[in-house]
């Protein structure tokens, strides 16, 4: 994504706006539910357990057998994560739930990892008959249980099957978790977050592909397995700001409001030069 594109902003269609408005209502419902029970997203998904680094929560992860959407929450060791972050959700769509026509990007280097000691991997459990799985977006949560950042990762991080950004964007609408466990409110919230921030997620996926290809050209490494490249794009977010933008679009539907959302700033942790976090 060129610098000029980032400066101008991200175009948002009327169809996307409608989905974002609906998602905003779900987010508000989830907030009210959690507040009424004096709970938060992390406590819900971990059932108030002490968080152990690298363990996936809940036990067995969350998988919807109808949509084939999947997610888990985990945290890195305290010395390897930002001090404001408590952990993050990784979201996926498995092969059986993908739209028609999506094709994995297969390169010979995918099977090569010339690393003496590979870093920890956060691969999802296999569910369903097929192996292919796409990582959609990760959502970082702060110590208060609020979302603070969206980010994408290199292939080795989750062991995913690599699909082009445009194909992964087509998968976003198919992330639906209708299950009640471990928490119906968390399941609804994650799906709504993907829709509420859909323009930003799509832009992050495009940035992910640019980061990976730029790294590959400059460093001539097996990029998908290179542990030096972990975070491929990231964006700090403020939920209340996004909700206010959506409210503006809803209150002024005839004025072309919210045709654009704020542009992505220069990415950290992997953006362009691929500095892993």
Label the predicted regions.
Residues 1-65:
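N-terminal domain-onset segments
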Residues 11, 89, 140, 147, ...:
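Compositionally biased, intrinsically disordered low-complexity regions
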Residues 5, 124-126, 141, 270-273:
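Compositionally biased, low-complexity repeat tracts
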Residues 60-148:
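Aromatic- and glycine-enriched beta-alpha-beta binding-site module
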Residues 184-277:
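Long, compositionally biased interface segments
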Residues 57, 74, 273-276:
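Short amphipathic alpha-helical "recognition" segments used for binding
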Residues 110-227:
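Conserved binding-pocket/active-site segment within a compact domain
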